[in-house]
């Protein structure tokens, strides 16, 4: 899409870098990367190829995880480097983003003659969609750049929502990062709930990604007939329902489906608890979500804290909605400390909500809040 074949792009390029997704992404890399390597070597048999693992803000990928992702043959025979966003010596400053934040990316990517990437496209609760340009930012960017991109001003934008790209300031910076880094070509897939590929796009980093997002929007967008008094959502079950931090994403689907004062019921096991110390402490210690939000919005872009965006989005939800958690018994007291109501099961949560909203309350049920794109009813 919008690009010559990868083999054509590789001609005359000595130093080729393929940015690859890390262990947190269910990308079928062992089926994608061999074809990308083959194409590159068809165009230039002598190309030096590096697989750069886009860990973003995550921990390093282990050898065992690499083998699971790529297979023994690729791990044993290809040059693989793992990005570390904390290692400033490994970064190159390649310019300033539209937001004013510096764009510091991994030197391996910055020094490439040809920079390409693989990945997958799914809905994203503040970048609109994952994939494409996200291989650069946050994928191979420094901590400074990632935090700047996730600043409170950007998260506060009404356009920083699931499925929205136009007007989204986070996306705007990511697109700029892609262009400044000269990300030339992508192979991105879309997968279903069973982790099977249902669609793939390849080509120009911007055009192919846009085409993939359009497919996904048509594939999974739901427009409720009317806003709900009570909206029930989940985080898709294991492994995405292990903690409250992760569960914010599924909660945003219920937020989109509900009236401004609607009650949200979040069904998520959260067996690992809160999932982020900063996330937990911020919500536990605030006098109210509104007061915490006011403090967050005062934080300058260059002083953004890790996890700040997650508790900012959680605050936004709690300022508008009562949230009832249906979760494991072990962590219910902690959830109450953070400002949530809790229930033993869905029936009890529904009884609590109906008691407030009445027997004629309109109820929306979202079986998997992380894989559906809910467009707010008009």
Enumerate the language-model features and the residues they cover.
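Glycine-rich phosphate/diphosphate-binding loops that line cofactor/substrate pockets in enzymes
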Residues: 1-17, 41-47, 181, 222-230, ...
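Structural motif
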Residues: 17-19, 116-118, 229-234, 265, ...
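Histidine-anchored nucleotide/phosphate-binding helix
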Residues: 25-46, 247-257
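An acidic, phosphate/nucleotide-engaging active-site surface
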Residues: 61-129
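Conserved phosphate- and dinucleotide-binding cores of soluble alpha/beta proteins
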Residues: 95-97, 107-110, 114-187, 192-193, ...
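Membrane-embedded hairpin module used as a gating/binding unit in multi-pass transport
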Residues: 160-238
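C-terminal non-catalytic interaction/assembly regions of soluble proteins
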Residues: 247-248, 252-378
